[in-house]
Amino acid sequence: MNPRDLACSALLFAAATGIPSAPAFAALPAAVAGTPLPTLAPMIRKVSPAVVNITTRGVSSQSGAHDPLREDPFYNRFFHSPPGQGPEEQPFASAGSGVIVDARDGYILTNAHVVDHARAITVTLEDGRNLKARLVGIDTPTDIAVVQVDARGLTQIHLGDSSRLAVGDFVVAIGNPFGLPHTVTSGIVSGLKRSGFSPDDFENYIQTDASINPGNSGGALVNLRGDLVGINTAILSGSGDNIGIGFAIPVDTAASVMRQLIEYGAVDRGQLGVAVYAVTAEVAHSLGLAKATGGLIAQVSPGSPAGKAGLRAGDVITAVAGHPVASNVDLRDALGFLRVGDEVTIDLLRNGRAERRRAVLADTLAPAPDGAAGGPHARLHP
């Protein structure tokens, strides 16, 4: 028997007879041995008390036979159930999440669709306390709402800067999916300025692959420092299953709406009085523009702020209040958080020449031709 055959025979014998061999131990790679493993636990411990569970009860108009899924506002918003035989008043109980943004005064940010039509709102803190909440204000176009509780010992989250986010940044979602309290999932920023899901809404979503499910609505999307960068609001799915495409409202948008809701109880949007189309490559070529950018004015309301400022159909708006307008979505969002009476500068191109105009926003409604995106001035919503 050659040495190789002898070695094989010895191995077979050992396996068959159960002769003990030297124990094997899992070992850490040399690069991490003796050093702490990376963990998000300290950040989560800091942020988690600022995330709350929100349960609501109310009555809404429903169609057709009773379906428990249709009592979930998240489901109804994104996975519309089949139409039934007619509307009827239906009591509902639903759940979502929220984020404490002001510990002193008890203000909590959440989604509008979490508290819409609610007659009773209950906030459950991480420490188990159940608190009655009142609705401060709701803004359906941005899907943002603010509720308030009267309590001591609250923990508020630190507001970050969503304009500094970049694709590839790590983010963490915290909420109460399916009633599982303070569930934490992680991922990255998969995309920015996502829009086009609804022609009637303000859309400037952060896209993330951090898992978002029913009950996460209104919860926190934070960066690795624990700063709030978004309010989780939706997923993209044909079946209702999470496929790794979730969306959050940027905190810059949420904070702007929040301030107006707290101060005024509603968002008083200034109107410009124009309807615009996106500048496509074909439109840019026909207008002699170097690139497809800006919002092409399709129509101006007579007597509107735009009309008084001298804007005309065919003008291309390139900036509002110093903010570049690369698309009609940018224009809509730029105007969407300005108030009645605000004066804004409008940079535009007319016959290939750059001009600047000033307009004082009013509450004038804009025309909305078929296919046009009129922006907030045409009462488009998120």
Residue ranges of predicted features:
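Protein maturation boundaries and topogenic segments
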Residues: 1-2, 298
